[in-house]
Amino acid sequence: MKSLSFIRHAKSDWTSPLVSDHDRRLADKGQRASTIIKDFFETANKNFDSVFSSTALRAVETIEIIKPSLKDTEIMYKKDLYTFDDHMMLEFISKIKDDISSVLIVGHNPAIQETVLRLSDTEQNSNLLNRVEHKYPTAAFCTLTSTIDKWSHTGDTMFKIKEFICPKEL
């Protein structure tokens, strides 16, 4: 059984047009949303075998706020996750070591939303699937589960959406 979770980075600051996309920081709203997700993780006792994050500053700041709720789980920052493409995201997932059962990825849209939709079984809980399809807001958290035993077997419609949580709901 594999568990694949995603967080879209929290709301970033667009006030400085001279800052590169990779170097944009979190806005105050993004910091608050990240704290809400951190509190949710603590309350729900969320655990992950591995955590991977994009190297973009807004993703790094998002996971650094959440980090205290992750106990001793190491966070690995991967340039490959600074992507907006679901094919690149799936390639990254397929290379995860098989002894890792539960993964959290902090990244970007549309890659996260498209990956979740692509991997999700369309005959499952349509409410969760419809919500993800409608919008994957900043700082939203989603978990997918599958009976596959190797990450390289990850493919279309092989996962079920277990939960989809937005900070505004908490």
Predicted segments with their positions:
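Glycine-rich phosphate-binding loop signature in dinucleotide/nucleotide-binding domains
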Residues: 44-46, 95-101
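Domain-level recognition of soluble alpha/beta enzyme cores
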Residues: 123-162
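Functional cleft and adjacent loop/helix regions within the main domain
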Residues: 76, 82-84, 149-170
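Active-site-proximal alpha-helix that buttresses catalytic centers in soluble enzyme cores
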Residues: 2-84, 121, 136
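Short phosphate-binding loop-to-helix
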Residues: 81-98
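Residue-level preference for the first positions of well-ordered beta-strands
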Residues: 4, 102-104, 141
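Short, glycine/serine-rich, charged loops/turns that create anion-binding
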Residues: 11, 56-58, 110, 148, ...
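A glycine-rich beta-strand to alpha-helix segment
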Residues: 101-120
